[in-house]
Amino acid sequence: MAMIPSISKLLFVAICLFVHMSVSFGDFSIVGYSQDDLTSTERLIQLFNSWMLNHNKFYENVDEKLYRFEIFKDNLNYIDETNKKNNSYWLGLNEFADLSNDEFNEKYVGSLIDATIEQSYDEEFINEDTVNLPENVDWRKKGAVTPVRHQGSCGSCWAFSAVATVEGINKIRTGKLVELSEQELVDCERRSHGCKGGYPPYALEYVAKNGIHLRSKYPYKAKQGTCRAKQVGGPIVKTSGVGRVQPNNEGNLLNAIAKQPVSVVVESKGRPFQLYKGGIFEGPCGTKVDHAVTAVGYGKSGGKGYILIKNSWGTAWGEKGYIRIKRAPGNSPGVCGLYKSSYYPTKN
């Protein structure tokens, strides 16, 4: 895609008015645009307006809209150039397409306390044989995964990751899938810092000690408040303890995932991760982990192995809120640091 020059505010407003009547909730392709959309400024503005409608985006004034359009256009150029390469994944115009990578990182990334902290938990999955593992695991198909949620601009990924694992093990042990409260962890888990970051095993320790309420009783607010756990009525879900997967090994993590959903961490700050739309993601990314997610399965597609990850950025990101990250065989930190820090709840 050839870069289209920036336009003046007056021209931008004029074109916006011209195309306004024709904009509707279009049926976007899987990546959110077609090559025809790249042929003129008018088509780009129409695409931008359609994208705004699809993602319920509103801007305070024309200056802000023009600023976001320029970022959108730059991201679209990056998406198109990336998708022309022979990758196993593709990018698209998701919810974050009007954010620069710096803005995206400030709002959604870096919400982990140092994930290299070593904890003295049970290490049940150490150097176990992978020969007898099932070829594919998907805990969604077994009814152990609740719908994808959105953490908003609160740095609470650690709470979402932990809660998803507790929901999973509770379903496996009791046969009941219930949605649990991330907000309780944001408000009440004292070693973490609410919307300013946390650490999944601390959250899992909290649940083992105190239990956790239903999401309907303690709903998510995307901001830290006063702990209300003692005032909230209704049932709670409790676990028995916390387990740790020995890090930096594919087999250990696969063994753990085969038994239950697992909290994992990744480096998510890169532009490809921000704009990921589908396929098996293989980078580029580093291993300085900054975001907690949940491994809910694994498998192979087109001969490539992957770990199935549930994220907390809503269903408009990735594969309806999920990402498949390429497996790295043997001993390594894994793609995007996926094997570096993995924990799970235990429940008798």
Swiss-Prot record:
- Glycosites: 86
Q: Which GO molecular function annotation, any one, does this entry have? A: cysteine-type peptidase activity
Q: Propeptide at which positions?
A: 17-132
Q: Does the keyword Transmembrane apply?
A: no
State which Enzyme Commission number(s) the record gives: 3.4.22.30
| Keyword set, alphabetical order | Disulfide bond, Glycoprotein, Hydrolase, Protease, Signal, Thiol protease, Zymogen
GO biological process terms on file? proteolysis
Task: Return the InterPro entries for the record.
Answer: Papain-like_cys_pep_sf (IPR038765), Pept_asp_AS (IPR025661), Pept_cys_AS (IPR000169), Pept_his_AS (IPR025660), Peptidase_C1A (IPR013128), Peptidase_C1A_C (IPR000668), Peptidase_C1A_papain-like (IPR039417), Prot_inhib_I29 (IPR013201)
Q: What does the record say about activity regulation?
A: Repressed by the active-site-directed cysteine protease inhibitor E64 (L-trans-epoxysuccinyl-leucylamide-(4-guanido)-butane) produced by Aspergillus japonicus.
Which residues are the signal sequence here?
1-16
Which reactions is this enzyme annotated as catalysing? Hydrolysis of proteins with broad specificity for peptide bonds, similar to those of papain and chymopapain
- Keyword Glycoprotein recorded: yes
Give each disulfide bond as a residue pair.
154-195, 188-227, 285-336
The UniProt annotation places E64 binding at 157
Active site positions, chain numbering: 157, 291, 311
Stated role: Cysteine proteinase with a high level of diversity in substrate specificity.
Q: Partners and quaternary state?
A: Monomer.
PANTHER family assigned: CYSTEINE PROTEASE FAMILY C1-RELATED
What family classification does the UniProt entry report for this protein? Belongs to the peptidase C1 family.
Q: What is this protein called?
A: Caricain
